[in-house]
Amino acid sequence: MKILSFALCLTLLILPSCRKSNREAKRIPLEITYSQHAVIYEYPPPKDIPPYVHAPTEPAVFMVPNGTRLLSAGKPVTSSDPEPIIGSLDLITDGDQDPGEGHYVELLGGPHWVQIDLGRSATLSAICLWHEHSPYRIYQDVVVRVSNDPDFRSGVTTLFNNDGDASSGLGKGTDSPYAESRFGLIVDGRGVQGRYVRLHSNGNASNIHNRYTEVEVHGLP
């Protein structure tokens, strides 16, 4: 009887873990509803920039664990620039990817960051970022980091870094610069655990502006 009871308890302990493992093992395409009102701004291409990934003409298929959902909708956003030049920080998580004024927030020139508080730690699947809708906007020193520490002093994981000369002070990045588009940038969350997502930039190859249209954080709650 004791052996049977022990086996039953062991089974009950293992089952939730198995369910979670099965859920994470099955991968499905990430669902993103892209803006249908995207405008391609007629900016001239910047000069003297390193090789970069050109703007895609169609959305990428990115696989994530089954059960992944949008975690960042309506979540609070803070920034190294508490008083943006244009717009308000809540535009970053309002679910609106449309281009143009009234849809983006613009920070001061120079190195800046925005930070999303998910409310609690979660297992991250993907982070999607839209600065602007333009094939000739190539943002500089883009770094995406995750932590459970709101001050990012400990337990920090870097998921993306294209700061090739380490000028941002966050380490030398190996990711490529990329051109903006209505399909944004999808960063692999790698199953990292974290509550806070911080995104850095240092203007773009054309000007000093730091604009953010939308950020989506997808994961397993």
Residue ranges and their predicted role:
Residues 1-4:
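Positively charged n-region of N-terminal signal peptides that target proteins for export
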Residues 60-96:
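Predominantly extracellular/luminal regions of secreted and cell-surface proteins
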Residues 21-68:
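N-terminal pre-domain segments of enzymes
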Residues 15-17:
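C-terminal motif of bacterial Sec signal peptides marking the signal peptidase cleavage site
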Residues 111, 119-126, 194-195:
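Extended extracellular/luminal ectodomain segments enriched in beta-structured repeat modules
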Residues 22-42, 80, 106-112, 134-221:
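Trp- and acidic/polar-enriched beta-sheet ligand-binding modules for extracellular glycan
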Residues 77, 123-134, 199:
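A short beta-strand element within beta-rich, extracytoplasmic domains
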Residues 7-13:
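Bacterial N-terminal signal peptides
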